Amino acid sequence: MARYTGSVWKKSRRLGISLTGTGKELDKRPYAPGQHGPNQRRKLSEYGLQMQEKQKLRFMYGLNERQFRTLFDKAGKMKGIHGENFMILLESRLDNLVYRLGLARTRRQARQLVNHGHVTVDGGRVDIPSYAIKPGQVIGLREKSKNLDVVKEALEANSFVPEYTSFDADKMEGSYTRFPERSELPAEINEQLIVEFYSR
């Protein structure tokens, strides 16, 4: 299944969650798109709820189905709670951490920065968005990329970096200091529903 490239705002409204991380998609019309507007009601089955939760998380991190399932299966082989491990693996992706550090305004923008070779890990260029970052590794930008308008705008707009990261504004680089706790990850996601979906 290909990565979704349609209207992120419509998808956000349909799933009831901000996929860009800005929340702007739900400001004016916090209900699913369609002619019935806020009055439309549709009760989902158990399977429907599980599917919806999977889609919410998949679209939030911008993965296609194959990438998403591969990471889910990898999490199942780790010690600990399957769903939490899965969330941590998603959070440890390079594109996500570029976004978390404030070097990009959205994960989609962060993915483009990585794809175009602007991002470094421990001083070396890495152009693989799915690259798994380990605690202690340093994420930065190539020298010529530090003047990109999209980066400057993102840094100006960002006022928060997670406690499991650190950021040096002068060097425009940050570290993944530790794996996050579940309480530090998206509260609007019920990962157990995703585990149940793939266990059917």
Curated annotation (Swiss-Prot):
Description of how the protein assembles with itself and partners: Part of the 30S ribosomal subunit. Contacts protein S5. The interaction surface between S4 and S5 is involved in control of translational fidelity.
Protein name in the entry: Small ribosomal subunit protein uS4
Signal peptide annotation: none
UniProt record similarity statement: Belongs to the universal ribosomal protein uS4 family.
Keyword RNA-binding: yes
InterPro entries assigned to the protein according to its UniProt record, in alphabetical order: Ribosomal_uS4 (IPR022801), Ribosomal_uS4_bac-type (IPR005709), Ribosomal_uS4_CS (IPR018079), Ribosomal_uS4_N (IPR001912), S4_RNA-bd (IPR002942), S4_RNA-bd_sf (IPR036986)
Domain S4 RNA-binding intervals: 92-152
Region (Disordered): 20-41
Organism of provenance: Oceanobacillus iheyensis (strain DSM 14371 / CIP 107618 / JCM 11309 / KCTC 3954 / HTE831)
PANTHER family: 30S 40S RIBOSOMAL PROTEIN, SMALL RIBOSOMAL SUBUNIT PROTEIN US4M
